[in-house]
Amino acid sequence: MSPERSQEESPEGDTERTERKPMVKDAFKDISIYFTKEEWAEMGDWEKTRYRNVKMNYNALITVGLRATRPAFMCHRRQAIKLQVDDTEDSDEEWTPRQQVKPPWMAFRGEQSKHQKGMPKASFNNESSLRELSGTPNLLNTSDSEQAQKPVSPPGEASTSGQHSRLKLELRRKETEGKMYSLRERKGHAYKEISEPQDDDYLYCEMCQNFFIDSCAAHGPPTFVKDSAVDKGHPNRSALSLPPGLRIGPSGIPQAGLGVWNEASDLPLGLHFGPYEGRITEDEEAANSGYSWLITKGRNCYEYVDGKDKSSANWMRYVNCARDDEEQNLVAFQYHRQIFYRTCRVIRPGCELLVWSGDEYGQELGIRSSIEPAESLGQAVNCWSGMGMSMARNWASSGAASGRKSSWQGENQSQRSIHVPHAVWPFQVKNFSVNMWNAITPLRTSQDHLQENFSNQRIPAQGIRIRSGNILIHAAVMTKPKVKRSKKGPNS
C-alpha cells in the first residue's frame, strides 16, 4: 500500500472515530442517570457497557412478562431522586401507604455508595466485586413494570442536592437499622406438657385446714426448718444435724431411749421439719429396722428410707411416737417422695417432739367413714384419700388397734415395723369428694401375724406406714394382739 493512499484514507478514519464517540455517549445516556457525575467520571467504558447490558436484560424480562429483580444500581439512583421529590413540603401528590415505606435495601445501598466513592479506580478492575455489587439482593417487589418507566430527574439536578439527600438518607438509614430485626435473634420458647399435680405435691395448712400447692392463699408459703449442715459419712451425723433450738436427750416416755426436745422458743403451728434422711432401699427387710418409713412412688411401687445408720440419717430418727392424742404435736406426711414432720400444735420450750400419723390428723381433715371396728384378728382398714375436702376417717380412734390408745401398763409396747395381715377392702366410704384419688389398695404384708415388742425400748414413729399427701395410710385393727419380745436394746 502506498503512503499517498494511506494519507488519503486517514482523514476518513478520523471522521469515523469522531462519529463513534457521540454514539457511545448516547448509548450510555440511559445508564448515566443512575450515577452522580463523580461516579460516572471514574467509571470505565467496560463498566458502563456491563451496566447497560444488565439494564437491557432486565427490561427484556419485564417486557415478556417475567418477574425480575431490579438491578441494584438502578434502585440506588431511583431512591435518591425520590428523596429529592419528598423534600417539597407543599406537594399536592396524593398520599399512599407505599410512599411511606422505608425499603430495607436503603441502608445497604447507602453503605455501598460510600464504599464505591472511597475505592480507588483500580479496585473496579476486580470483576468479582462488580458481580457482588450487581447481584445484591433487595426486597423490593418490582413486578410492576410501570415503576421502571417513571420519569426521573436529570443527573445535574440530583448532584446539586446530593449532599443534602445523603444526610437525609443517613438519618433514615439509622431509623431503618433500629426497626429491622433478625429472625435468628428471636427468643426461644420451650413448651412442655402440663401435668396434673400428684398426691404428694400438696401441703396442708393447719390454720385454715386446707390443702395447697407451694403457698397457702391465706397464710403464704410454709416454713421449712433446715438441718445443720453435716457431711454424710460422719459417724455422729444424726446428732450433729440437729437444728438450733432443739436438743437430743432422754425421752419423757418411760424407758423409751432418747428423744428430741424444744429448748429455745415456741415452735409455731404449721412449722415443717425435714426431710427424713437415711438409706434409700426397696428391700423389705428395712421395715424391721425400726427407723424406716415406707414411701409410695406409684401404684404398687414402694421404697424405704431407713435411718438406722447414724452416719447417713439425720436428727429426725430420734423423734419418738406419741402415746395418745394429747401428746402428739407433730404429723408425718410424704411430700415429693420424702418424709416430713409438721407441727400440728404450738410446741412450748421444754416439751418433747412426738410424732404420729393416725386418726388425730384424720379428724382435723374431717375424715368420715361408715366402717365399724373389726371383731376378729386379721382384719384391718387401709384408709386414705386424695385432695378432697371430705375424706374417710379412720375408725381406729376407738383405740382397738393402732397402739396409740392401747394400755401401756409399764411394758412400753413399741410400734416398730407394724405388719398388718389381710386387709379388708374395698370398704364403703361416705362423703368422698369428686377430686379424691381413686387409690384405695390392699395393704402389703410380709407376715401373717402382728408383731410388737414390749421390751425396754423407745417408741419410734418410723414403724408407721404412711402415704403421700399428708394422709394417714395404714391403721391396723386388732384385738388381743400377740406380741414377741425383741432382742434389741434401748435407743442410743
Curated annotation (Swiss-Prot):
GO molecular function: histone H3K4 methyltransferase activity
Domain called SET: residue spans: 244-358
Residue ranges of every copy of the KRAB-related domain listed in the record: 23-86
Keywords, sorted A to Z: Chromatin regulator, Chromosome, Methyltransferase, Nucleus, S-adenosyl-L-methionine, Transferase
GO biological process, one term: methylation
Positions of region (Disordered): 1-22, 111-179
Pfam families per UniProt: KRAB (PF01352), PRDM2_PR (PF21549), SSXRD (PF09514)
Compositional bias annotation for Basic and acidic residues: 167-179
Assigned EC number: 2.1.1.-
Catalytic activity: N(6),N(6)-dimethyl-L-lysyl(4)-[histone H3] + S-adenosyl-L-methionine = N(6),N(6),N(6)-trimethyl-L-lysyl(4)-[histone H3] + S-adenosyl-L-homocysteine + H(+)
Cleavable signal peptide: none
Protein's name according to its UniProt entry: Histone-lysine N-methyltransferase PRDM7
Source organism of this protein record: Homo sapiens
